[in-house]
Amino acid sequence: MLGTGEAALAELSDGRILYNSREHMTRGNRFMAHSDDGGDLWLGAYRSADLPDGVRGTSYGCLGGMVRLPIAGHDILLYSNLDSEAGKMPAQVGGSTREFSENVTVWASFDGGRTWPVKRLVHDGPGAYSTLAVGRSGTPSQGKIYLLFEGGPKSWDEAVQVAAFNLSWVLDGRDIGTLLGKAH
């Protein structure tokens, strides 16, 4: 995937691999593609209509996380990144790529990454890179979702934090049955 990097991969229930990537000199939202053959060939490259690639209004993307939840027969994915409109252009044109990076947020997809109808703010202060992991079945972490992110109260680079939550928290009262029904 020329021009992309710092990607996240998720295997879907049908065996396809979903690719979700930052674009270093971005023209917009997150870059996506899929592979039907285990990653040898990537097909259907497009920009997500829903997922930002870092702070909007800049030309530089940001590392984000993506993970598939281990729920049999369903392709529920989570994505993490910044959800901010406060961007400035890079220093070469008088701005800063990090000065207004904020609002670490998680989005949820119920259709294998085609749409992302749910989002939930995790950290409303300065933030930057993030990644996601899920707990394993049969362990104390079962059902938990972990978000590791850069961010603190004053600056994106003053701390690395871990937020732990579950899918119910992400949904914030929305009915999962309704969301799964819309996905099919």
Task: Set out the residue ranges of the language-model regions.
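Asp-box/BNR beta-propeller blade signature and adjacent active/binding-site loops
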Residues: 1-184
